A protein has these predicted regions:
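Conserved redox-cofactor binding core of oxidoreductases
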Residues: 13, 134-264, 483
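Redox-cofactor-proximal catalytic regions of oxidoreductases
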Residues: 83-171, 175, 347-350, 363-364, ...
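Glycine-rich loop(s) and the adjacent beta-strand/alpha-helix scaffold that form part
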Residues: 54-57, 61, 68-73, 77, ...
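A glycine-rich dinucleotide-binding beta-alpha-beta segment and adjacent secondary-structure elements
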Residues: 205-212, 224-231, 238, 265-268, ...
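Extreme N-terminal leader/targeting segments of oxidoreductases
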Residues: 2-39, 57-58, 544-551
């Protein structure tokens, strides 16, 4: 039995776990804390993990920090929902506001690889108009990057991650073929397709970051997806293409160091106002790593928390906060669902949970609300499903037991919908302290009228689709949420944004933010592909800035 990856650091003494070999190790370069590395990266998920690999491959010295453990998927992951909660960020946080956000496994990860270790692998591009949503569609804020530019980085990300997808994707501008063929649909996916066709809207196989055929690469070999169904609880075969299986091995091979179980609590600045390194807790004590540049990539809650916790005499309101926007404009995505029972068995747990998708309402503008949404087939595992029943139907005891007997006959569709930016929705610091003595995040959230209108519309459409295929005992789950964004938005004006298009702080030129917190708008699709595309662009821009002597 493998040791607990949360008990003590695994990436030490010049080696890190080789996740492609049971009990294996891979060489890892180590850097002195007293020597200033080119980049200290806080977080190793879709943003930080990608950036660590691509900067190291350009020859920069990189140390990447993660508060979570360094898991070995072949040994540490179990077919046990409760045990796999170890992958989630469940540290103390304070939530408030009119509509407090549920935090944990649905939107936070605590492991090398970040939340990509337990994400659902849905790999979608933004609708082109969303990059100029204010100018083009009349809501939100414009991105400082055009869709044409992002399309190039999306294509790179899809190739590097080895996305499995349909031969042609029916929405948006034409794009190259996905590297791997689409996954075969399970019964839940086929029923989504049937429901969409019944109400006259399109559907397709979902582009997924999990292999549909064997993959062999310099980092290691991976088999195709075994349709085990535990995607959101850690993939035991390495078929999942996460930061842990794609970017971190590349980072190590290129000379980066990864420090697991290393909680960064403060970014330090010097007399000249530039950052000088990070204070981090590891092996029972606080340490300091000098760095020429610091990249904060802790996602939409931990990124602003770190910037605010790093306040000092020169920056009393926190780092990169000259605009006063650090922590503000927090956005979540709505995750409402429709559930029903089919007479024939569905066995929706077989395979990835979202094998089929419709993006119709992202591209149809005949709506009475701003933004858009997609919906996908679902396949929750038993514990997840019991949570749905207790939450949405208020079932307990014998009523819950009886409802669970229908598990293999259930069908569900779940949306990912865009919620609009609002400065009142924010991350700030609470009075409560965590296990490191640091103020925890306070997450304040309230739904707007547009958010509610979008959810109402989606529930009507999803209900119609499963009613049309004969589902009965239909019920709604209205208030669920998922992915986060905002809180350190990028922009073209330092008065209205935290970082520029390159993810570089306007206020402190050697401080960068590279994760979903830079999103000016959150879109109506899953964010992980966009985060990785942004990281690829940022790495490219850093290389060019360095060559021009402008770092």
């Amino acid at each position: 039995m493998a040791s607990d990856p949360r008990a003590q650091p695994r990436a030490t003494r010049g080696r890190a776990p080789d996740i492609f070999r049971k009990g294996g190790w891979t060489p890892m370069r180590e850097y002195s804390e007293g020597d200033a590395v080119d980049f200290a990266i806080v977080g190793t998920g879709a943003g930080g993990g990608t950036l660590a690999a691509l900067l190291a491959e350009q020859g920069f010295s990189v140390v990447a920090f993660d508060a979570g453990g360094y898991f070995r998927p072949l040994e540490d992951f179990a077919s046990d929902e409760t045990a796999q909660n170890q992958l989630y960020w469940t540290d103390k946080r304070v939530v408030d506001g009119a509509n407090p956000i549920k935090m944990g496994g649905n939107n936070s990860g605590k492991a090398v690889g970040g939340s990509t270790v337990h994400y659902a692998m849905v790999a979608l591009r933004f609708r082109p108009e969303w990059f100029k949503s204010h100018t083009t569609l009349g809501y939100g804020a414009d991105w400082p990057i055009s869709w044409q530019e992002m399309w190039r980085y999306y294509a790179i990300a899809e190739q590097q991650i080895n996305i499995s997808g349909p031969l042609t994707y029916p929405w948006g501008p034409k794009r190259p073929r996905y590297p791997y063929r689409a996954h075969e649909l399970n019964t839940a996916g086929k029923l989504l397709a049937k429901g969409c066709e019944a109400i006259g809207i399109g559907w397709t196989e979902t582009p997924l970051a999990t292999l549909s055929a064997p993959h062999s690469g310099p980092e290691g070999n991976s088999p195709p997806c075994a349709y085990r169904g535990f995607c959101r609880f850690g993939c035991t075969t390495n078929a999942k293409r996460s930061a842990l299986t794609v970017w971190i091995p590349r980072a190590l091979a290129a000379g980066a160091e990864v420090r697991d179980l290393a909680m960064v609590g403060r970014v330090e600045t010097g007399a000249n106002g530039r950052v000088t390194g990070v204070h981090y807790h590891r092996d029972g004590g606080w340490r300091f790593q000098r760095a020429k540049n610091v990249v904060v990539a802790g996602y939409a809650v931990e990124t602003p928390r770190l910037l605010l916790n790093s306040a000092n005499q020169s920056h009393p309101d926190g780092l990169a906060n000259a605009s006063g926007l650090v922590g503000k404009n927090l956005m979540t995505q709505t995750n409402a669902a429709i559930w029903g029972r089919m007479e024939e068995p569905v066995r929706w747990y077989k395979g990835p949970p979202s094998l089929a998708i419709t993006e119709h309402w992202n591209y149809d503008d005949n709506k009475d609300f701003h933004g858009g949404y997609c919906w996908m087939g679902q396949g929750p595992l038993p514990n997840e499903w019991a949570s749905v029943l207790t939450g949405a139907r208020r079932l307990w005891g014998d009523g819950l037991r009886h409802a669970m007997l229908d598990y293999n006959h259930m069908i569900g569709v779940k949306m990912v919908g865009e919620m609009l930016p609002n400065e009142a929705n924010r991350v700030s610091l609470a009075d409560d302290l965590d296990q490191y003595g640091l103020p925890v995040a306070r997450i304040t959230y309230a739904w707007g009228e547009n958010d509610k209108a979008l959810v109402r519309h989606s529930l009507e459409q999803m209900s119609a689709s499963i009613e049309a295929i004969g589902a009965n005992d239909i019920f709604r789950q209205e208030d669920d949420t998922c992915h986060l964004g905002g809180t350190a938005r990028m922009g073209s004006d330092p008065r209205t944004s935290v970082v520029d298009a390159d993810c570089r702080s306007w206020e402190i030129p050697n401080l960068w933010v590279c994760d979903g917190s830079v999103f000016p708008t959150v879109g109506g699709v899953n964010p992980s592909l966009t985060i990785q595309a942004i990281a690829i662009r940022t790495a490219e821009r850093i290389g060019k800035l360095a060559a021009a002597g402008e770092l």
